[in-house]
From Swiss-Prot:
The lineage of its organism: Bacteria, Bacillati, Bacillota, Bacilli, Bacillales. The keyword ATP-binding applies. InterPro entries: Hyethyz_kinase, Ribokinase-like. Belongs to the Thz kinase family. It comes from Anoxybacillus flavithermus (strain DSM 21510 / WK1). ATP binds at residues 119, 165. This is Hydroxyethylthiazole kinase. Its EC number is 2.7.1.50. Pathway: Cofactor biosynthesis; thiamine diphosphate biosynthesis; 4-methyl-5-(2-phosphoethyl)-thiazole from 5-(2-hydroxyethyl)-4-methylthiazole: step 1/1. GO terms for biological process: thiamine biosynthetic process; thiamine diphosphate biosynthetic process.
Amino acid sequence: MMNVGQWLTRVRKESPLVHNMTNVVVTNFVANGLLAVGASPVMAYAKEEVADMVRLARALVLNIGTLNETDVEAMLIAGKAANEANIPVIFDPVGAGATAYRTETARRILREVNISILRGNASEIASIAGEQVRTKGVDAGDVQSDLVDVAKKAAHMFRCVVVITGKDDIVTDGERIVIVSNGDAMLTKVTGTGCLLSSVLGAFAGVGEDVMTSSVAALAYYGVAAEKAATQAKAPGSFQLSFLNALHETSAEEVDQYARIQGE
């Protein structure tokens, strides 16, 4: 489909500044993860400065994991400023479907900000797209609808690239469909790996124009690094350390060699 490794090379060469408005559980892990990738993280939340900060960045990542109205107000300000500056916005609707407030907040952000990439698990994306699914906490529930159809529906609804992550990752712009099958189950045993992935999607989107292709490349790289880390660590604590190292050490050539990608 593409030379996905070249995107990693570009990220490491350009070290894009990624403005993260993420949750308090994962802030340190996300910042260190982006540094390991080769990007530059900034975490800024105050509504008084987010518009100025986002104009310095190459991507904006919005994550509602620890949700409150103050942060939502700041996210909307930052998102609109990013739209004005043609900076890609990545939205991670953590826990959408778990509560009415969380689901409606996700939909509000999608109404008021033009999102470039919507990244979530199956139940989060299904809930936002109007599919009926019960969610246990913020983990993926059982989605009856075909996930590809759910992803395409969401892509058309919100006019963006949709990434549904799971054992196999689905990427679509509403027309093209790509499946990325890299990764390791140990990712589910360390909190923040999904949130970091959303920020890595931002780093890759920040160095090119085609967010569909950049998303596929980011997913392949992230999954290959996870597979590499899993060969060195068999428990969550050591895996977290090994994964950060693998993000730093994985080469563009390894991504091209081990990426498992199907689709256009």
